Amino acid sequence: MVNAIEAFDAKHMKPAEEIPAFRPGDTVEVNVKIKEGNNSRIQAFTGVVIARQGGGVRETFVVRKISFGTGVERRFPLHSPAIDSIKVVRKGRVRRAKLYYLRNLRGKAARIVERRDNSEK
């Protein structure tokens, strides 16, 4: 039974090369495949990752952005076939794994300091 579950998970997981290394605080652009009737298109959703949960094929992440003054959050399954690509736009420096406190902050208070990597010399 356990082997069947592991085989199912391995079959449905995306290869590690397709998923960039990102963590909470990073700004990402998620390109999602949208199907409308008989045609499909790709829609970009750019925002700050405020949480990552789960593991394996069940792993999800939450992206938050401000759209026309209103906060919009969207939860994406990491290995979903509906996700075309994920691109890290900016790396952020935070000290928490879950950034739910950003929901209560407005304007400059909701900014996240950029993380500098010294390894890119």
Curated annotation (Swiss-Prot):
GO MF: structural constituent of ribosome
Cysteines engaged in disulfide bonds, as pairs: none
Top-rank lineage group of the source organism: Bacteria
InterPro entries xref list: Ribosomal_bL19, Ribosomal_bL19_CS, Ribosomal_bL19_sf, Translation_prot_SH3-like_sf
Record keywords, A-Z: Ribonucleoprotein, Ribosomal protein
One GO term of the biological process aspect: translation
Record keyword Ribonucleoprotein present: yes
A single cellular component GO annotation: cytosolic large ribosomal subunit
Cytoplasm as UniProt keyword: no
Pfam short name (any one): Ribosomal_L19
NCBIfam families from the UniProt entry: rplS_bact
Family (UniProt): Belongs to the bacterial ribosomal protein bL19 family.
Annotated PANTHER family: LARGE RIBOSOMAL SUBUNIT PROTEIN BL19M (PTHR15680:SF9), RIBOSOMAL PROTEIN L19 (PTHR15680)
Function, in words: This protein is located at the 30S-50S ribosomal subunit interface and may play a role in the structure and function of the aminoacyl-tRNA binding site.
Protein name: Large ribosomal subunit protein bL19
The species this protein was found in: Bifidobacterium adolescentis (strain ATCC 15703 / DSM 20083 / NCTC 11814 / E194a)
Taxonomic lineage from the root: Bacteria, Bacillati, Actinomycetota, Actinomycetes, Bifidobacteriales
Gene: rplS
